[in-house]
């Protein structure tokens, strides 16, 4: 909850964007962003509601469905824009439903907007004629979605012939439910987080919207990650428009620029559908034809080891629970790569160590048995044997630390990844990726490669998140390209 001293400042934060939704503003102040995040409640700024309605304002709809209506910002604006259309607002949260009804009464729209309290994924929606599905679906990460709903998502996608990851967020469930409900002539216009444009779980959504089965992409506008759309949520954002039952045609792509949807390009529907990442088509400058050698041809890119509970397995500085022979010096903080601690022997000696016990504890020398017994008792007391990772690791205590790679790569931040050589053979946990040469590589060649990558890697080659944050998965690193001349020294 937010303390009284913060209320005025918080209200000022929302007031400029709410266009008179005082009830919604008050709700956001009373329930801070962290408490709302679990339910995916982030109210849409009024200017974006209007821009999305501008996108479809020249068309006629008989029914407009606000999917995950919150306090009704889309429903109320749509009722004013489309005075003849039937407006349906669907919201599951009982408190928001009460605020929505209150707002409709205050706006004199109680008879224009039908409110349905329930889960959009399963409620029956009364509709007639051509229907528009619009809104800001709740953004709930897969960690907070029950196994039952993950199964629902996978099976419903499978019924459409689409393989879907259970790691998808709740917003993808709403996109699926809308697509299932659409008939020829219907349309959708949503603002969602933008991760699905590029990442693995998003491939199902990209197939759903761009696969040509029944939907056709119309427009795609991505927010600049450094300029968040929402006042209190550092999430990436994209406005997506798709129609049902129309012939594929060029898709308008661009940016959410200031308070407008700015179209920069027209991309062939087939070209967009075939692209492994869609966000690249929304940038001001489209990528040049690919040249050079993919890094994945030279290196195997591997995530760092997942311990399951770093607090138990990563030994604090000076911690003497285990003999040194039963632990390994490891990179455990991204800052250690940024500061290039691994460049020197003394730097590696200062790294924290990670417990590395053999699977067979009987193999431990007698003089170390008591220390190991004490360490494992402490780890159990911390719950290290009950984490998901430990329960799927046989035996639970054997954290199989990675063989030292030739080089490390940081993978998340508001800067391009940092590439560092590993001459003193440190290991690493999952705060970095490791580069393992597919063939022997000379130290001068490795140095030239890393220097080039540190100088020339574009932040946008990763997966962009809100607040300018970029994440580079192993596949993203493997797809980076280097000129052939870097290998032989003819290109710096």
Predicted segment positions?
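Generic, well-ordered alpha-helical scaffold segments in large soluble proteins
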Residues: 51, 55, 99, 103, ...
């Amino acid at each position: 909850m937010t303390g009284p001293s913060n209320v005025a400042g918080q209200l000022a934060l929302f007031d400029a964007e709410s266009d008179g939704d005082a009830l919604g503003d008050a709700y956001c102040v009373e329930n801070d962003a962290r408490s709302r995040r679990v339910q995916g409640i982030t109210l849409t700024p009024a200017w974006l509601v209007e821009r999305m309605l501008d996108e479809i304002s020249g068309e006629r709809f008989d029914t407009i469905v606000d999917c995950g209506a919150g306090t009704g910002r889309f429903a109320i604006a749509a009722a004013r824009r489309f005075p003849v259309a039937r407006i349906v607002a669907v919201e599951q949260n009982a408190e928001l439903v009460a605020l929505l009804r209150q707002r409709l009464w205050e706006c004199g729209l109680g008879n224009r907007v039908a409110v349905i309290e329930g889960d959009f994924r399963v409620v029956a929606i009364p509709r007639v004629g051509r229907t528009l599905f619009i809104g800001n679906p709740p953004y709930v990460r897969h960690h907070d979605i029950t196994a039952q709903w993950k199964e629902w998502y996978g099976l419903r996608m499978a019924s459409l012939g689409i393989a879907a990851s259970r790691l998808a967020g709740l917003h993808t469930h709403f996109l699926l439910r809308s697509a299932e409900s659409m008939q020829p002539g219907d349309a959708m216009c949503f603002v969602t987080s933008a991760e699905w444009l590029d990442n693995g779980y998003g491939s199902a959504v990209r197939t759903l919207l761009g696969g040509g089965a029944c939907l056709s992409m119309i427009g795609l506008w991505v927010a600049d990650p450094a300029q968040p759309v929402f006042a209190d949520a550092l999430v990436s954002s994209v406005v997506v428009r798709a129609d049902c039952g129309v012939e594929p045609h060029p898709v308008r792509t661009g940016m959410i620029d200031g308070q407008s949807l700015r179209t920069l390009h027209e991309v062939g529907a087939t070209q967009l559908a075939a692209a492994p990442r869609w966000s690249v088509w929304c940038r001001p400058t489209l990528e040049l034809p690919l040249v050079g050698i993919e890094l994945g041809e030279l290196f195997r890119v591997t995530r760092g080891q997942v311990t399951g509970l770093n607090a138990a397995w990563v030994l604090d500085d000076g911690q003497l629970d285990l003999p040194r022979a039963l632990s390994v010096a490891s990179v455990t903080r991204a800052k250690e790569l940024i500061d290039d601690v691994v460049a020197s022997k003394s730097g590696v000696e200062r790294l924290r160590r990670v417990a590395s016990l053999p699977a067979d504890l009987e193999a431990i020398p007698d003089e170390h048995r008591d220390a190991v017994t004490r360490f494992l008792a402490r780890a159990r007391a911390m719950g290290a044997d009950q984490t998901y990772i430990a329960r799927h690791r046989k035996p639970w205590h054997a954290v199989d630390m990675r063989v030292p790679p030739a080089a490390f790569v940081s993978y998340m931040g508001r800067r391009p990844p940092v590439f560092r050589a590993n001459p003193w053979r440190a290991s690493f946990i999952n705060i970095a990726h490791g580069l393992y040469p597919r063939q022997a590589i000379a130290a001068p060649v490795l140095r030239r490669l890393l220097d080039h990558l540190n100088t020339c890697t574009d932040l946008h080659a990763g997966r962009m998140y809100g607040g300018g944050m970029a994440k580079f998965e192993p596949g993203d690193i493997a797809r980076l390209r280097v000129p052939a001349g870097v290998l032989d020294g003819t290109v710096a």
